[in-house]
Amino acid sequence: MPGDEERGFLAAREELASALRWDSAQVFPLEQLMPLLATSLPPAARYLQLDAGRLVRCNAHGEPRNYLNTLSTALNILEKYGRNLLSPQRPRYWRSVKFNNPVFRSTVDAVQGGRDVLRLYGYTEERPDGLSFPEGQEEPDEYQVAVVTLEVLLLRTELSLLLQNTHPRQNALDQLLRESVEDGMLQLSEFHPLLREIVPGPRPSAQGSTPGPCFLCGSAPGTLHCPACNQVSCPACDILFHGHPSRAHHLRQALPGSHQTASLSSSLPASSQPRPPSSSLALGDSSLSSPDPANACLPWHCLTCATLNEPWAVFCAVCSQPKGCKVPGIEGSHGTGGLEPEPARDQWACQSCTFENEAAAVLCAICERPRLAQPPSLVVDSHDAGVCQQSLKQEDPLLTAAQPQVWYCDHCTFCNSGPVWVCAMCNRTRDPIPTQPALQSYPSSLEKGRPKPGSSQHLGSSLPASCGDPEKQRQDKMRKEGLQLVSMIQEGETAGASPEEVFSALQYSGTEVPLQWLRSELSYVLEMVAELAGQQDPELGAFSCQEARKAWLDRHGNLDEAVEECVRARRRKVHELQSLGFGPKEGSLQALFQHGGDVARALTELQRQRLEPFHQRLWDRDPEPTPCWDGLDRQSLVRRLLAVYTLPSWGRAELALALLQETPRNYELLDVVEAVRHSQDRAFLRRLLAQECAVCGWALPRNRMQALISCECTICPECFRQHFTIALKEKHITDMVCPACGRPDLTDDAQLLSYFSTLDIQLRESLDPDAYALFHKKLTEAVLMRDPKFLWCAQCSFGFIYEREQLEATCPQCHQTFCVRCKRQWEEQHRGRSCEDFQNWKRTNDPEYQAQGLAMYLQENGIDCPKCKFSYALARGGCMHFHCTQCRHQFCSGCYNAFYAKNKCPDPNCKVKKSLHGHHPRDCLFYLRDWTAARLQKLLQDNNVMFNTEPPAGTRAVPGGGCRVMEQKEVHSGFRDEACGKETPPGYAGLCQAHYKEYLVSLINAHSLDPATLYEVEELETATIRYLHLAPQPADGEDLPAYQARLLQKLREEVPLGQSIARRRK
């Protein structure tokens, strides 16, 4: 039965796993993880899925801090893989993990057992380029992923505490390293894949046995063993092979019996790599084909030129042909010059290392050079050839035991050090001619075994001729690679990437698509650089991605050098800030992290923090008291004004002080300063500082007053706010004019736009938000009413835009249908008929219409506003001056001509311009209402127009008698619609006298009859003076009828009754 401690551990573990499943981005504080880390349970009981002890032991090579850092970094990446699988929005390619991912290669794949952690996540299907989920599995097992992710998180936290020496159990590392095999085997069934990978491979030969040859060159003895690659190599080939970024973190160990005495890290110093001793050389042609490893370290004869070469040489020292290669046409001492058999069709031989690769391989499996790569150039520098010839002649015995430690590459002129044969810059093999001093030890054998190859002069002259084509190929290849690099840089600049970023991406990853790599992988690399830099020197704090990016670009993508550069740069910046008085305790590390390593911005932030108390005291203090302007030290007051308020000159400061010292002191300091900046005229300044409000008479400085663009009136802020607030809430939009002079005239469309555009800015700063919103609403309605497509509903007085051409319109508010022209309620009988025909049909066939009599006729011929087209079902009796409630337009209800206010009439000859008036045509009800009914009837009879003198048939009488025309009457409770009720004389068709005259005048206007035909001479003279502004006089000898006929003709010709009347344009 499990104990209490184990049960508590399992319960806490399940709780954290459930929280991780619920929120994959959950960050567990150290206090929450500490109970799981401080338990006394062994690792096998704490890590049920992950074999943590074996994972640590199999990667424990070298210093504990180094391999714990490497393992912690790999676990951090593995934890991110698990969190991505638990996230609701997983990455696009979550189903597979690619081995060529640079972050994966340099972190997870650099430790033993990393891939099997991925298999625990569910990546169980092997692919040639990586791992993936099985095809039939649609979703990952969330419980399994959560448990494994939690154990990875716990192990990473435990390693971090060990690195910081803060682990609650001091023997935690010993527990992980010394766990017995029996405890590890308890979990063999659960974690069998991990055991298979992390069990170390077989070591090379035991102590005392002869090491095998290098797996790369096959000549030099292997002295180093790489457990990750399970290969043995010589020091020179080890530097070349493990210089690749994917193998840079492999740990190598010296083989027993070799000259290496300690395990080697990923970077081996050149001075510590021994050369094979010259005493091991032995002559004999049989050694070339001996399969015995002991004989593999013997010198070999070139099959082309028969030159004896050292055992570790890959190319011939004279003809530069690979080992075992025959060239037709050149016969050696051991061959006939025949062609060497070609490789099989399913294989190809590498031109650099002669390894035979599979036909489908693009890169060599040994040296990773491309299939079409040319062999190293055979051009020999003249200086090196001369040194070689001189060495051959002198036969210095010291050269047999000494190897030059510094040599220059013939291709890139890079200075290499140590006994390496491959250039560290361009990966070209060094020229073997000057590195063959061992040949001087066997002159007799060389002379007896083969013919002499010729003198040194012959060698120097024959090489350029035989190597011309390879040199041209090398130059062509360099040109092609350069053009490819330029093309990639241009493509990167087009996409926004700098040339340094493209080049660094190529150097780091070797990818052919650097832009795609920069978008997908650069962020992970920068995070790794920042994390490694922080682990290298924790005292420097956290590193930002901007610092990591700069260091990575400066070091052209070299990860290790970028980490070193990042640390060096941070140390330099911290020292610079510390010299300025801001050390780590003052927050310099945090400031550098926040501002991406920018010293200037970090210094600004630190200075701001240091000045924050001063600013706080400055603003928290009470307002500074106003100085006494009557002080004895006048010069001090002037200097204070000049300095604090930045006045333009000393004279302006004295003028401001003089105004402040005047009595009575009605001026404010800021008002005086503002006024003095604009002028130095004292009289003008006094007027500027004491502007009188045109409404209330309050005196204020000019800069506090409000003014409209339509007039020169100055209004104080309080009057301005109250006037426009009342106008908005209780009046029309056209009443928002100057409260003092009443300008501008908002009936003019040209003034309307410019006035309201400026007034909008002033009202925004003066009115309350509710009043300002009401202003915008009313202004919008006023603009819509000016649209020619705007239409008022005849039933509910709702306005809307009607863009159709049909006469039948439906109101969107009350959904009633009416005629667009005559405003009558739409009936099916109106379809296909004009409005006049429909009205005649209703008079004849509609009983309700007939029952109303002539009152319905007057109601249908109500008042329509000529500006906004709003209809009023009112009779025209009473005052003819009508004020529209919708648009505030003033007009005559009889002729629809406008009424003009004082001094607003556009007629220059108008004699009543200084009063409210209107200009009416002679057939307007304004004049004809003074005629008697009999005279109006005579005008209709003279023109054969029928009219009613009795109520139409079927008309119902009003209870109590009286006129039936509906009127709006004012009562105590408001307005009420009711019948006129006045007395109806006989012969007036059931109407009162006023409404009967209105009925007759409407017939006269409908038939365009001219009442001037019934004018007397006095009426003709009055009409001539009114419309023609002339005082007519009878001609000499002209009788009265002729004079009357002449005035009538003149009036009808010069003042006709046509379409100029607004009523007829309705």
Curated annotation (Swiss-Prot):
Binding sites annotated in the UniProt record for Zn(2+) 2: C711, C713, C738, C741
Chain intervals for the UniProt region annotation (Disordered): 251-287, 434-478
Catalysis performed (reactions): [E2 ubiquitin-conjugating enzyme]-S-ubiquitinyl-L-cysteine + [acceptor protein]-L-lysine = [E2 ubiquitin-conjugating enzyme]-L-cysteine + [acceptor protein]-N(6)-ubiquitinyl-L-lysine
Residues bearing PTM Phosphoserine: S377
Polyubiquitin-binding: annotated span: 1-479
E.C. no: 2.3.2.31
Binding site for Zn(2+) 5: C865, C868, C884, C887
Subunit structure: Component of the LUBAC complex (linear ubiquitin chain assembly complex) which consists of SHARPIN, RBCK1 and RNF31. LUBAC has a MW of approximately 600 kDa suggesting a heteromultimeric assembly of its subunits. Associates with the TNF-R1 signaling complex (TNF-RSC) in a stimulation-dependent manner. Interacts (via the PUB domain) with OTULIN (via the PIM motif); the interaction is direct. Interacts (via the PUB domain) with VCP (via the PIM motif). Interacts (via the PUB domain) with SPATA2 (via the PIM motif); interaction is direct and bridges RNF31 and CYLD.
Name under which the protein is recorded: E3 ubiquitin-protein ligase RNF31
Lineage of origin: Eukaryota, Metazoa, Chordata, Craniata, Vertebrata
Gene that encodes the chain: Rnf31
